[in-house]
């Protein structure tokens, strides 16, 4: 394995397996946002602390000696994980008329800690960000509000109150914040007049009413006979990004699919070689999800222990002793409509829809399914989710 996108996908699945243990219903998060924030900590970490971060994020498989390079700032060599992040974030944050995509990271550090200039220069270069000097010791509540306000501004006010009351104390020293915002319109929009109330079955015994969008069109599609499921790619305008949907054949088939799913299988199933353009009768519910995660215990369970306690070696960040990561909170929001994802009321693009083609396949998302949003050029998964309860 040599690419950051592959490492990100592997970490995404490790995280998903942890979330599955405690969350039976909806799941939604941004793996690339979390890894980029932790990458900034890795840039200032050394020895065991750096090795633990690298191993959990699968960065140790991206290039050799990543941790050593990170600690000494010798990170210009092409292929190095931080260098790859620099290219990736530049690619993501390019302005385009087709969609809005913005990834923003920030570290908020207790102002009594003096951060090294080399570190500040490096995170600016590779992660397009800075350390914000923050008075946690004397003004924890004001600090909390300041962080929340920054997150709101970076996510078009979709993510509010990332840090609830009481989550920032005067013993806080370092807070990682990652924010990602995406708004895209479908390449082929759903016609609103085709949206009807239909049943969605969370399980075989109960159903809930949803607004089910529908369109007949040509999509990249594949049957996954070995796991009794099918996969469909729904492109966004410009086709730089897509939503990929994994749908079990049976109403209660999601658990079996999740158990068999791996990063390697996902990449294989959704490759251009495996999928073919097919006429599909697509039924997709209109939905909105907002999910929050406190990742500290999850990351510790996965093996990232030192950064959260007195053993943290963040001497590449500061000469001061006692610095450790206090919080890693993550919140993600998605809204899927006829227009697209988190679509604004912009001028409509007229799309010529196929006039009732002879449908080869039906893809009816009326029971729990998995979905993810992918940047196709870099094969990077921006968001990953499970929709199982409207």
UniProtKB/Swiss-Prot annotation:
Modified residues (N-acetylmethionine): 1
Chief place where the protein resides: cytoplasm
SUPFAM superfamilies recorded: Serpins
Positions marked as site (Reactive bond): 354-355
Molecular function GO labels: enzyme binding; protease binding; serine-type endopeptidase inhibitor activity
Biological process terms in GO annotation: negative regulation of peptidase activity; protection from natural killer cell mediated cytotoxicity; regulation of proteolysis
PROSITE patterns documented for this protein: SERPIN
Keyword Cytoplasm: yes
Disulfide bonds: none
Cellular compartment(s): Cytoplasm
CDD domains, A to Z: serpinB3_B4_SCCA1_2
GO cellular component labels: cytosol; extracellular space; plasma membrane
Tissue expression notes: Squamous cells.
InterPro entries: Serpin_CS, Serpin_dom, Serpin_fam, Serpin_sf, Serpin_sf_1, Serpin_sf_2
Keyword entries, A-Z: Acetylation, Cytoplasm, Protease inhibitor, Serine protease inhibitor
Signal peptide bounds: none
Function summary: May act as a protease inhibitor to modulate the host immune response against tumor cells.
UniProt xrefs under PANTHER family: SERINE PROTEASE INHIBITOR, SERPIN (PTHR11461), SERPIN B4 (PTHR11461:SF186)
Protein's UniProt name: Serpin B4
Natural source organism: Homo sapiens (Human)
